[in-house]
Protein backbone atom coordinates (compact mmCIF):
# COMPACT_ATOMS: atom_id res chain seq x y z
CA UNK A 1 0.00 0.00 0.00
CA UNK A 2 1.35 3.43 -0.99
CA UNK A 3 0.61 6.70 0.77
CA UNK A 4 0.56 10.05 -0.97
CA UNK A 5 2.99 12.48 0.64
CA UNK A 6 1.69 16.04 0.74
CA UNK A 7 3.57 18.97 2.18
CA UNK A 8 0.31 20.44 3.45
CA UNK A 9 -0.67 17.29 5.39
CA UNK A 10 -1.63 18.13 8.97
CA UNK A 11 -1.77 15.47 11.66
CA UNK A 12 -5.19 15.47 13.28
CA UNK A 13 -7.34 12.67 14.63
CA UNK A 14 -9.58 12.95 11.56
CA UNK A 15 -6.58 12.68 9.22
CA UNK A 16 -5.30 9.68 11.18
CA UNK A 17 -8.69 7.97 11.04
CA UNK A 18 -8.70 8.44 7.27
CA UNK A 19 -5.36 6.59 7.10
CA UNK A 20 -6.89 3.85 9.23
CA UNK A 21 -9.92 3.56 6.94
CA UNK A 22 -7.71 3.49 3.84
CA UNK A 23 -5.80 0.53 5.24
CA UNK A 24 -8.59 -1.23 7.16
CA UNK A 25 -11.94 -0.52 5.49
CA UNK A 26 -13.63 -2.86 7.99
CA UNK A 27 -11.90 -1.20 10.94
CA UNK A 28 -9.76 -2.76 13.67
CA UNK A 29 -12.60 -4.21 15.73
CA UNK A 30 -11.82 -7.82 16.55
CA UNK A 31 -8.15 -7.45 15.62
CA UNK A 32 -5.43 -7.74 18.25
CA UNK A 33 -3.77 -4.37 17.74
CA UNK A 34 -0.73 -2.90 19.46
CA UNK A 35 1.65 0.03 19.20
CA UNK A 36 5.40 -0.46 19.51
CA UNK A 37 6.01 2.09 22.26
CA UNK A 38 9.56 3.31 22.88
CA UNK A 39 8.61 6.35 24.93
CA UNK A 40 9.87 8.70 22.24
CA UNK A 41 7.61 11.41 20.88
CA UNK A 42 6.60 9.57 17.70
CA UNK A 43 5.33 6.40 19.40
CA UNK A 44 3.74 8.42 22.23
CA UNK A 45 1.71 10.36 19.66
CA UNK A 46 0.82 7.23 17.71
CA UNK A 47 -0.52 5.47 20.80
CA UNK A 48 -2.56 8.56 21.74
CA UNK A 49 -4.05 8.69 18.23
CA UNK A 50 -4.89 5.00 18.21
CA UNK A 51 -6.48 5.17 21.66
CA UNK A 52 -8.63 8.13 20.60
CA UNK A 53 -9.60 6.42 17.34
CA UNK A 54 -10.41 3.26 19.29
CA UNK A 55 -12.76 5.13 21.60
CA UNK A 56 -14.69 6.36 18.59
CA UNK A 57 -14.71 3.02 16.75
CA UNK A 58 -14.98 0.61 19.66
CA UNK A 59 -11.60 -1.13 19.72
CA UNK A 60 -8.90 -1.08 22.42
CA UNK A 61 -5.23 -1.12 21.39
CA UNK A 62 -2.34 -2.42 23.49
CA UNK A 63 1.27 -1.28 23.77
CA UNK A 64 4.50 -3.24 23.49
CA UNK A 65 7.79 -1.91 24.86
CA UNK A 66 11.08 -3.59 23.97
CA UNK A 67 13.66 -3.09 26.73
CA UNK A 68 17.01 -3.38 24.91
CA UNK A 69 19.12 -2.55 27.95
CA UNK A 70 21.53 -0.54 25.79
CA UNK A 71 21.08 2.80 27.55
CA UNK A 72 21.75 3.51 31.23
CA UNK A 73 18.27 5.06 31.18
CA UNK A 74 16.56 1.96 29.75
CA UNK A 75 14.75 1.23 33.03
CA UNK A 76 13.52 4.84 33.15
CA UNK A 77 12.09 4.46 29.65
CA UNK A 78 10.24 1.32 30.68
CA UNK A 79 8.84 3.12 33.74
CA UNK A 80 7.76 6.06 31.57
CA UNK A 81 5.95 3.75 29.16
CA UNK A 82 4.14 2.02 32.02
CA UNK A 83 3.03 5.34 33.52
CA UNK A 84 1.94 6.69 30.14
CA UNK A 85 -0.11 3.58 29.39
CA UNK A 86 -1.70 3.80 32.84
CA UNK A 87 -2.64 7.39 32.05
CA UNK A 88 -4.27 6.33 28.76
CA UNK A 89 -5.86 3.23 30.27
CA UNK A 90 -4.22 0.71 27.93
CA UNK A 91 -2.35 -2.49 28.63
CA UNK A 92 1.43 -2.61 28.27
CA UNK A 93 3.74 -5.57 27.78
CA UNK A 94 7.44 -4.95 28.39
CA UNK A 95 9.88 -7.44 26.90
CA UNK A 96 13.55 -7.46 27.91
CA UNK A 97 15.95 -8.60 25.20
CA UNK A 98 19.68 -9.18 25.00
CA UNK A 99 21.20 -7.56 21.92
CA UNK A 100 24.14 -9.41 20.39
CA UNK A 101 25.87 -7.85 17.40
CA UNK A 102 26.53 -11.09 15.48
CA UNK A 103 28.53 -9.16 12.90
CA UNK A 104 26.00 -6.31 12.73
CA UNK A 105 26.21 -2.74 13.97
CA UNK A 106 24.50 -2.09 17.29
CA UNK A 107 21.55 -0.33 15.60
CA UNK A 108 21.00 -3.15 13.13
CA UNK A 109 21.37 -5.81 15.83
CA UNK A 110 18.84 -4.05 18.08
CA UNK A 111 16.44 -3.66 15.18
CA UNK A 112 16.80 -7.34 14.27
CA UNK A 113 16.08 -8.39 17.85
CA UNK A 114 13.15 -6.00 18.10
CA UNK A 115 11.47 -7.27 14.95
CA UNK A 116 12.02 -10.87 16.02
CA UNK A 117 10.08 -10.10 19.21
CA UNK A 118 7.38 -8.33 17.21
CA UNK A 119 6.86 -11.44 15.09
CA UNK A 120 6.57 -13.74 18.11
CA UNK A 121 3.81 -11.81 19.88
CA UNK A 122 0.98 -12.87 17.61
CA UNK A 123 -0.54 -9.43 16.99
CA UNK A 124 -2.92 -9.04 14.07
CA UNK A 125 -1.73 -5.45 13.64
CA UNK A 126 1.41 -3.87 15.08
CA UNK A 127 1.58 -0.12 14.50
CA UNK A 128 5.00 1.53 14.19
CA UNK A 129 5.55 5.27 14.43
CA UNK A 130 7.84 5.87 11.44
CA UNK A 131 7.01 9.16 9.74
CA UNK A 132 7.79 11.04 6.54
CA UNK A 133 11.22 12.28 7.66
CA UNK A 134 12.18 8.74 8.71
CA UNK A 135 11.29 7.61 5.21
CA UNK A 136 13.60 10.19 3.65
CA UNK A 137 16.43 9.16 5.97
CA UNK A 138 15.88 5.48 5.18
CA UNK A 139 16.11 6.14 1.45
CA UNK A 140 19.30 8.17 1.83
CA UNK A 141 20.87 5.47 4.00
CA UNK A 142 20.09 2.93 1.29
CA UNK A 143 21.75 5.17 -1.30
CA UNK A 144 24.83 5.57 0.89
CA UNK A 145 25.09 1.82 1.48
CA UNK A 146 24.55 0.78 -2.12
CA UNK A 147 21.15 -0.75 -1.53
CA UNK A 148 19.18 -2.38 -4.33
CA UNK A 149 15.55 -1.85 -5.27
CA UNK A 150 14.15 -3.28 -2.04
CA UNK A 151 16.36 -1.06 0.11
CA UNK A 152 15.74 2.06 -1.99
CA UNK A 153 11.97 1.49 -1.80
CA UNK A 154 12.43 2.23 1.92
CA UNK A 155 9.61 1.38 4.34
CA UNK A 156 6.27 0.05 3.12
CA UNK A 157 3.16 1.35 4.84
CA UNK A 158 2.06 -2.25 5.39
CA UNK A 159 4.02 -5.48 5.38
CA UNK A 160 3.56 -9.02 6.74
CA UNK A 161 4.48 -9.81 10.34
CA UNK A 162 4.98 -13.40 11.43
CA UNK A 163 2.50 -15.93 10.11
CA UNK A 164 -0.73 -13.92 10.06
CA UNK A 165 -0.05 -10.39 11.30
CA UNK A 166 0.94 -7.14 9.63
CA UNK A 167 3.12 -4.17 10.46
CA UNK A 168 1.34 -0.89 9.85
CA UNK A 169 3.02 2.53 9.59
CA UNK A 170 0.15 5.03 9.66
CA UNK A 171 2.31 8.13 10.25
CA UNK A 172 4.27 7.92 6.98
CA UNK A 173 2.16 10.70 5.40
CA UNK A 174 3.12 13.11 8.21
CA UNK A 175 6.31 14.96 9.07
CA UNK A 176 8.29 15.13 12.28
CA UNK A 177 7.00 18.69 12.70
CA UNK A 178 3.38 17.52 12.35
CA UNK A 179 3.98 15.07 15.19
CA UNK A 180 5.58 17.74 17.38
CA UNK A 181 2.64 20.05 16.76
CA UNK A 182 0.14 17.33 17.71
CA UNK A 183 2.06 16.52 20.90
CA UNK A 184 2.19 20.17 21.96
CA UNK A 185 -1.50 20.66 21.25
CA UNK A 186 -2.45 17.68 23.43
CA UNK A 187 0.21 18.18 26.10
CA UNK A 188 1.75 14.75 25.59
CA UNK A 189 4.87 13.81 27.56
CA UNK A 190 7.81 11.97 26.07
CA UNK A 191 11.39 10.96 26.74
CA UNK A 192 14.37 11.70 24.54
CA UNK A 193 16.85 9.01 23.56
CA UNK A 194 20.26 10.58 24.04
CA UNK A 195 21.62 8.55 21.13
CA UNK A 196 19.38 10.49 18.72
CA UNK A 197 21.85 13.38 18.75
CA UNK A 198 24.98 11.24 18.45
CA UNK A 199 26.31 11.85 14.93
CA UNK A 200 28.58 8.83 15.21
CA UNK A 201 25.48 7.02 13.93
CA UNK A 202 25.05 7.49 10.19
CA UNK A 203 21.29 8.05 10.41
CA UNK A 204 21.84 10.92 12.85
CA UNK A 205 24.48 12.44 10.58
CA UNK A 206 21.93 12.47 7.78
CA UNK A 207 19.27 13.90 10.10
CA UNK A 208 21.30 16.68 11.69
CA UNK A 209 23.87 17.59 9.02
CA UNK A 210 23.52 16.16 5.54
CA UNK A 211 19.77 16.44 4.94
CA UNK A 212 19.47 20.02 6.26
CA UNK A 213 22.29 21.04 3.90
CA UNK A 214 20.71 19.29 0.92
CA UNK A 215 17.32 20.80 1.72
CA UNK A 216 18.89 24.26 1.88
CA UNK A 217 20.62 23.74 -1.47
CA UNK A 218 17.82 21.96 -3.37
CA UNK A 219 14.25 23.30 -3.23
CA UNK A 220 11.68 20.64 -2.28
CA UNK A 221 14.44 18.06 -1.79
CA UNK A 222 12.35 15.97 0.60
CA UNK A 223 9.41 15.91 -1.79
CA UNK A 224 11.69 14.70 -4.61
CA UNK A 225 13.00 11.88 -2.42
CA UNK A 226 9.48 10.80 -1.47
CA UNK A 227 8.40 10.85 -5.11
CA UNK A 228 11.32 8.54 -5.85
CA UNK A 229 10.33 6.25 -2.98
CA UNK A 230 6.75 6.07 -4.24
CA UNK A 231 7.91 5.24 -7.79
CA UNK A 232 10.32 2.60 -6.51
CA UNK A 233 7.63 1.03 -4.33
CA UNK A 234 5.37 0.79 -7.38
CA UNK A 235 8.18 -0.84 -9.40
CA UNK A 236 8.89 -3.25 -6.55
CA UNK A 237 5.20 -4.16 -6.23
CA UNK A 238 5.03 -4.87 -9.97
CA UNK A 239 8.22 -6.95 -9.83
CA UNK A 240 6.85 -8.99 -6.93
CA UNK A 241 3.61 -9.67 -8.82
CA UNK A 242 5.61 -11.03 -11.76
CA UNK A 243 7.85 -13.12 -9.50
CA UNK A 244 4.85 -14.62 -7.71
CA UNK A 245 3.35 -15.61 -11.06
CA UNK A 246 6.68 -17.14 -12.14
CA UNK A 247 6.92 -19.08 -8.88
CA UNK A 248 3.40 -20.41 -9.23
CA UNK A 249 4.32 -21.84 -12.60
CA UNK A 250 7.66 -23.27 -11.45
CA UNK A 251 5.99 -24.83 -8.39
CA UNK A 252 2.68 -25.52 -10.12
CA UNK A 253 2.90 -29.28 -9.61
CA UNK A 254 3.39 -28.86 -5.86
CA UNK A 255 7.17 -28.77 -5.96
CA UNK A 256 10.03 -26.66 -7.36
CA UNK A 257 10.49 -27.98 -10.91
CA UNK A 258 14.05 -27.27 -12.06
CA UNK A 259 13.21 -27.86 -15.73
CA UNK A 260 10.55 -25.16 -15.62
CA UNK A 261 12.85 -22.83 -13.71
CA UNK A 262 15.55 -23.24 -16.39
CA UNK A 263 13.25 -21.74 -19.05
CA UNK A 264 13.56 -18.26 -17.50
CA UNK A 265 16.18 -15.57 -18.02
CA UNK A 266 19.03 -15.38 -15.46
CA UNK A 267 17.51 -12.34 -13.74
CA UNK A 268 14.09 -13.93 -13.38
CA UNK A 269 15.63 -17.18 -12.18
CA UNK A 270 17.40 -15.28 -9.39
CA UNK A 271 14.17 -13.57 -8.33
CA UNK A 272 12.27 -16.88 -8.42
CA UNK A 273 14.91 -18.48 -6.19
CA UNK A 274 14.78 -15.58 -3.75
CA UNK A 275 11.00 -15.73 -3.55
CA UNK A 276 11.02 -19.54 -3.14
CA UNK A 277 13.41 -19.29 -0.20
CA UNK A 278 11.45 -16.45 1.39
CA UNK A 279 8.14 -18.31 1.04
CA UNK A 280 9.71 -21.27 2.84
CA UNK A 281 10.87 -19.11 5.75
CA UNK A 282 14.56 -19.23 4.84
CA UNK A 283 16.69 -16.09 5.33
CA UNK A 284 17.64 -15.09 1.79
CA UNK A 285 21.42 -15.33 1.27
CA UNK A 286 23.51 -12.69 -0.46
CA UNK A 287 23.74 -12.30 -4.22
CA UNK A 288 26.87 -14.46 -4.53
CA UNK A 289 25.25 -17.34 -2.64
CA UNK A 290 22.12 -17.09 -4.80
CA UNK A 291 24.30 -17.13 -7.91
CA UNK A 292 26.02 -20.29 -6.66
CA UNK A 293 22.69 -22.04 -6.10
CA UNK A 294 21.56 -21.00 -9.58
CA UNK A 295 24.81 -22.26 -11.13
CA UNK A 296 24.52 -25.70 -9.52
CA UNK A 297 20.85 -26.03 -10.45
CA UNK A 298 21.82 -25.24 -14.03
CA UNK A 299 24.95 -27.39 -14.35
CA UNK A 300 24.64 -30.33 -11.94
CA UNK A 301 22.14 -33.10 -11.25
CA UNK A 302 22.45 -32.82 -7.47
CA UNK A 303 23.34 -30.15 -4.94
CA UNK A 304 23.13 -29.38 -1.26
CA UNK A 305 23.29 -26.11 0.70
CA UNK A 306 23.16 -25.28 4.42
CA UNK A 307 21.22 -22.05 4.97
CA UNK A 308 20.88 -20.89 8.59
CA UNK A 309 19.01 -23.83 10.07
CA UNK A 310 17.71 -25.14 6.76
CA UNK A 311 19.02 -27.49 4.11
CA UNK A 312 18.34 -27.06 0.42
CA UNK A 313 18.64 -30.20 -1.72
CA UNK A 314 18.62 -30.54 -5.50
CA UNK A 315 17.70 -34.05 -6.63
CA UNK A 316 15.96 -35.62 -9.63
CA UNK A 317 15.07 -32.28 -11.17
CA UNK A 318 13.50 -30.86 -8.03
CA UNK A 319 14.56 -28.49 -5.28
CA UNK A 320 13.63 -29.45 -1.72
CA UNK A 321 13.71 -27.50 1.54
CA UNK A 322 14.08 -29.12 4.94
CA UNK A 323 14.67 -27.73 8.40
CA UNK A 324 18.05 -29.10 9.48
CA UNK A 325 16.51 -31.01 12.38
CA UNK A 326 14.24 -32.86 9.94
CA UNK A 327 17.31 -34.56 8.48
CA UNK A 328 18.60 -35.71 11.83
CA UNK A 329 17.17 -38.82 13.46
CA UNK A 330 13.45 -38.17 14.09
CA UNK A 331 12.84 -36.58 17.48
CA UNK A 332 10.60 -39.45 18.50
CA UNK A 333 13.51 -41.85 17.85
CA UNK A 334 16.28 -39.82 19.47
CA UNK A 335 16.84 -42.61 22.01
CA UNK A 336 17.15 -45.24 19.27
CA UNK A 337 13.96 -47.30 19.45
CA UNK A 338 10.49 -47.19 20.97
CA UNK A 339 8.92 -50.39 22.26
CA UNK A 340 5.34 -51.12 23.30
CA UNK A 341 1.88 -51.66 21.93
CA UNK A 342 2.30 -50.84 18.23
CA UNK A 343 -0.99 -49.01 17.78
CA UNK A 344 -0.31 -46.89 20.86
CA UNK A 345 3.28 -45.93 20.05
CA UNK A 346 2.46 -45.18 16.42
CA UNK A 347 -0.51 -42.91 17.13
CA UNK A 348 1.37 -41.18 19.97
CA UNK A 349 4.08 -40.18 17.49
CA UNK A 350 1.85 -38.70 14.80
CA UNK A 351 1.55 -41.76 12.57
CA UNK A 352 -1.74 -42.11 10.73
CA UNK A 353 -2.98 -45.69 10.36
CA UNK A 354 -4.21 -45.68 6.77
CA UNK A 355 -6.06 -48.37 4.89
CA UNK A 356 -3.91 -50.08 2.24
CA UNK A 357 -4.59 -52.92 -0.26
CA UNK A 358 -1.64 -54.84 1.22
CA UNK A 359 -1.35 -53.58 4.79
CA UNK A 360 -0.71 -55.04 8.21
CA UNK A 361 -3.48 -57.02 9.94
CA UNK A 362 -5.22 -54.83 12.51
CA UNK A 363 -4.73 -57.51 15.15
CA UNK A 364 -0.96 -57.24 14.67
CA UNK A 365 -1.06 -53.58 15.68
CA UNK A 366 -2.58 -54.58 19.02
CA UNK A 367 0.58 -56.55 19.82
CA UNK A 368 3.86 -55.29 21.24
CA UNK A 369 6.52 -54.25 18.78
CA UNK A 370 9.28 -51.79 17.98
CA UNK A 371 9.45 -48.46 16.14
CA UNK A 372 12.93 -47.54 14.87
CA UNK A 373 14.87 -46.27 11.87
CA UNK A 374 15.96 -48.62 9.11
CA UNK A 375 19.12 -50.69 9.43
CA UNK A 376 21.43 -51.85 6.64
CA UNK A 377 20.42 -55.51 7.15
CA UNK A 378 16.64 -54.98 7.13
CA UNK A 379 14.63 -56.81 4.46
CA UNK A 380 10.94 -57.04 3.58
CA UNK A 381 9.08 -59.39 1.27
CA UNK A 382 7.86 -57.48 -1.77
CA UNK A 383 5.81 -59.52 -4.25
CA UNK A 384 7.21 -62.73 -2.81
CA UNK A 385 10.85 -61.60 -3.05
CA UNK A 386 12.85 -60.38 -0.06
CA UNK A 387 14.44 -57.00 -0.72
CA UNK A 388 16.72 -54.81 1.33
CA UNK A 389 14.65 -51.91 2.68
CA UNK A 390 17.13 -49.36 1.35
CA UNK A 391 16.59 -50.81 -2.12
CA UNK A 392 12.85 -50.49 -1.55
CA UNK A 393 13.29 -46.84 -0.58
CA UNK A 394 15.47 -46.29 -3.63
CA UNK A 395 12.82 -47.91 -5.82
CA UNK A 396 10.22 -45.59 -4.32
CA UNK A 397 12.61 -42.74 -5.21
CA UNK A 398 12.72 -41.56 -1.64
CA UNK A 399 15.23 -38.74 -1.33
CA UNK A 400 18.70 -40.17 -0.57
CA UNK A 401 19.22 -37.95 2.47
CA UNK A 402 15.96 -39.21 4.03
CA UNK A 403 16.64 -42.92 3.58
CA UNK A 404 18.95 -43.41 6.62
CA UNK A 405 16.36 -41.91 8.99
CA UNK A 406 13.25 -43.57 7.55
CA UNK A 407 10.96 -45.15 10.21
CA UNK A 408 10.41 -48.89 10.27
CA UNK A 409 7.91 -50.98 12.27
CA UNK A 410 9.19 -54.30 13.66
CA UNK A 411 7.72 -57.03 15.85
CA UNK A 412 8.87 -57.65 19.42
CA UNK A 413 11.70 -59.82 18.05
CA UNK A 414 12.89 -56.91 15.86
CA UNK A 415 11.77 -58.55 12.60
CA UNK A 416 10.69 -55.85 10.09
CA UNK A 417 6.94 -55.70 9.50
CA UNK A 418 6.42 -52.49 7.54
CA UNK A 419 8.29 -49.56 6.08
CA UNK A 420 6.44 -46.37 7.02
CA UNK A 421 4.61 -44.68 4.14
CA UNK A 422 5.81 -47.42 1.71
CA UNK A 423 4.69 -50.99 2.23
CA UNK A 424 4.12 -53.88 4.62
CA UNK A 425 5.87 -57.23 4.39
CA UNK A 426 4.01 -59.08 1.62
CA UNK A 427 4.07 -62.41 3.48
CA UNK A 428 2.05 -61.05 6.41
CA UNK A 429 0.01 -58.38 4.62
CA UNK A 430 -3.76 -58.61 4.22
CA UNK A 431 -6.23 -57.05 1.86
CA UNK A 432 -7.50 -53.71 3.20
CA UNK A 433 -4.92 -53.75 5.97
CA UNK A 434 -3.14 -50.91 7.74
CA UNK A 435 -0.06 -48.96 6.62
CA UNK A 436 1.53 -46.54 9.14
CA UNK A 437 2.04 -43.13 7.50
CA UNK A 438 3.98 -40.20 8.97
CA UNK A 439 3.56 -36.67 7.53
CA UNK A 440 7.26 -35.81 7.81
CA UNK A 441 8.26 -38.65 5.50
CA UNK A 442 6.40 -38.14 2.25
CA UNK A 443 6.80 -40.31 -0.82
CA UNK A 444 7.55 -37.53 -3.26
CA UNK A 445 7.52 -39.40 -6.58
From Swiss-Prot:
It is found in: Cytoplasm. Its EC number is 6.3.4.19. Gene3D superfamilies: 1.20.59.20, HUPs. Pfam families: ATP_bind_3 (PF01171), TilS (PF09179). One of its GO terms (cellular component) is cytoplasm. It is an enzyme of class 6 (ligase). It catalyses: cytidine(34) in tRNA(Ile2) + L-lysine + ATP = lysidine(34) in tRNA(Ile2) + AMP + diphosphate + H(+). Signal peptide: none annotated. ATP binds at residues 38-43. One of its GO terms (biological process) is tRNA modification. Transmembrane segments: none annotated. One of its GO terms (molecular function) is ATP binding. Keywords: ATP-binding, Cytoplasm, Ligase, Nucleotide-binding, tRNA processing. Its main location: cytoplasm. InterPro entries: Lysidine-tRNA-synth_C (IPR012796), Rossmann-like_a/b/a_fold (IPR014729), TilS/TtcA_N (IPR011063), tRNA_Ile_lys_synt (IPR012094), tRNA_Ile_lys_synt_N (IPR012795), tRNA_Ile_lys_synt_subst-bd (IPR015262). Belongs to the tRNA(Ile)-lysidine synthase family. Ligates lysine onto the cytidine present at position 34 of the AUA codon-specific tRNA(Ile) that contains the anticodon CAU, in an ATP-dependent manner. Cytidine is converted to lysidine, thus changing the amino acid specificity of the tRNA from methionine to isoleucine. The N-terminal region contains the highly conserved SGGXDS motif, predicted to be a P-loop motif involved in ATP binding. This is tRNA(Ile)-lysidine synthase. It comes from Neisseria gonorrhoeae (strain ATCC 700825 / FA 1090). The lineage of its organism: Bacteria, Pseudomonadati, Pseudomonadota, Betaproteobacteria, Neisseriales.
